[in-house]
Amino acid sequence: MPTVEELYRNYGILADATEQVGQHKDAYQVILDGVKGGTKEKRLAAQFIPKFFKHFPELADSAINAQLDLCEDEDVSIRRQAIKELPQFATGENLPRVADILTQLLQTDDSAEFNLVNNALLSIFKMDAKGTLGGLFSQILQGEDIVRERAIKFLSTKLKTLPDEVLTKEVEELILTESKKVLEDVTGEEFVLFMKILSGLKSLQTVSGRQQLVELVAEQADLEQTFNPSDPDCVDRLLQCTRQAVPLFSKNVHSTRFVTYFCEQVLPNLGTLTTPVEGLDIQLEVLKLLAEMSSFCGDMEKLETNLRKLFDKLLEYMPLPPEEAENGENAGNEEPKLQFSYVECLLYSFHQLGRKLPDFLTAKLNAEKLKDFKIRLQYFARGLQVYIRQLRLALQGKTGEALKTEENKIKVVALKITNNINVLIKDLFHIPPSYKSTVTLSWKPVQKVEIGQKRASEDTTSGSPPKKSSAGPKRDARQIYNPPSGKYSSNLGNFNYERSLQGK
């Protein structure tokens, strides 16, 4: 093993040789042997090996292996020095191997070391993006779980920081191709991260790019399979996939496949859905997703059949007044509960799809069925008016901080929900029923559109989902509020707001 003095002497030989460096193979070999020495020798070797690496292609394997030994040394300062110099080895055919090594080194728990690995990966990314991706995806597909997890997170956080000259169209195509391989077997969280990666790619922000992403999500959602409402994994997969698809839909990228699947497979099983996460109102969650998608549904093969399924489900949440109930169960003083949150979603979805078959209520339903529906609408509208008056009175004069209390936030959302339902019911009371009104769903931010300005939706929307979806159902950007459905205003004649919030 060479001493510190011998290392310096051989370094001098190589440094003085200028253009004839490659003739001093023995001197470079001495430096390579420095990795077998003590702390001082290793530290010098970590600096000297990369400095002259390019002059000795025949010793490339030995040099990379020597540096790799130093990257795994027990001394953290030696590891850091060795990692810092790794990009100097990333030349030609060696680059994918260096990328592979750096990807494996992402598993370190030392924060300074981890940052060095990230910086080194970014450095070689700028030298050869395709080669670096080869190393990263190799570990994602075949590496240990911790390496796979961190490599995916590296891509999801760092790709967007790279300039366009690095992320060329060819590079983005490679990312898409390799991602498709990974998506054949991913966890829920990994799927969300890959959708974030892919939807952020410039080449996939066109109409055709968005369509490709929707098809990827549809494949992941397994829309060809029969839905199993009692399997929490099946339910969770559908929810996660649909959440990723929703921000991709636009007037040019249709949600038809998803809406059809929800109408045919999910709505009939709404009451038997198994929630994948404790505390989640799974039925309301499904109905909200359906409502959001319904705006972008294209031509549907079985429109009348699916509209009828949606209509029948809506009727379940729009009760007859007590005196009109056929079985008498609701007779007497007890008023049926009005589940405003559910009705907003179902009525909105029906209103959106109804536009495609405007004579559904008048030509497709028999007179008795239509009369029954009008009675239910009228009863619900009456309850709405009572509730809206109560809410407006409760919020009257409140501004700024006063509106930020938890109680008032609930009232504000409740007012949005009831106003939306009110507008939609008025449309359906028209003769013939109208489908012209536009409302913003209560949990969605109101979009202000300047006159003459295009809505910033369609093909330029940011690819990353507006929700920070984790493996579970939590979502950030939506600021989703689950009102205590079924607990809002029960007794129309004797309204008690505070009691309606019990159980929240």
UniProtKB/Swiss-Prot annotation:
Compositionally biased intervals (Low complexity): 462-472
GO biological process, one term: negative regulation of apoptotic process
Chief location category: nucleus
Keyword field: Acetylation, Apoptosis, Cytoplasm, Nucleus, Phosphoprotein, Repeat
Keyword Cytoplasm: yes
Superkingdom, taxonomy of origin: Eukaryota
Residues modified as Phosphothreonine: 399
InterPro entries: API5 (IPR008383), ARM-like (IPR011989), ARM-type_fold (IPR016024)
Region entry Leucine-zipper, spans: 370-391
Subunit record text: Monomer. Interacts with FGF2 and ACIN1.
Annotated protein name in UniProt: Apoptosis inhibitor 5
Organism annotation: Pongo abelii
